[in-house]
């Protein structure tokens, strides 16, 4: 028996093309993306949580949406519906493509030699790449929805569509490029 996400979209046909992210973008067949936090007690267990639920959890991070899972659920469901209507593609595939396109590969970290701090470029772990990508997407969507006539779902759908096309108007793509540019300058 095959389950469809929100009883609408089949996740078995979704592919992750970035080899580094394949083990960290979970595409399990579930109807309702809500694990009730079962993963929080085990390290790295969040990589086994559906990418759609992780997107919902990132939406709940802001102080205005803290703990409002039903609100995040409806925002994500409506955004996926808007993406499906605009592109006629599986919206989960569009989301995965957006995550791949906005996941930075390098960042800087601070080290101290002899009391002097230096910034050095380091590669980012795949788990952190997915986390940063989802954070950039949701932050861009929520910032554009604030004091705007467009709904949060519409802004999230727009951000995901722009990010999946690697459009420079996307907040997430801008943040990724900024992070990688800073890392390149630290070489």
Curated annotation (Swiss-Prot):
Superkingdom, natural source: Archaea
One BP annotation, GO: translation
Gene3D superfamilies found in the cross-reference section: Ribosomal protein S7 domain
Keyword Iron: no
Pfam families, per database record: Ribosomal_S7 (PF00177)
Subunit structure: Part of the 30S ribosomal subunit.
PANTHER family recorded: RIBOSOMAL PROTEIN S7
Biological role: One of the primary rRNA binding proteins, it binds directly to 16S rRNA where it nucleates assembly of the head domain of the 30S subunit. Is located at the subunit interface close to the decoding center.
Protein name: Small ribosomal subunit protein uS7
Taxonomic source organism: Methanosphaera stadtmanae (strain ATCC 43021 / DSM 3091 / JCM 11832 / MCB-3)
Taxonomic path: Archaea, Methanobacteriati, Methanobacteriota, Methanomada group, Methanobacteria
Gene that produces this protein: rps7
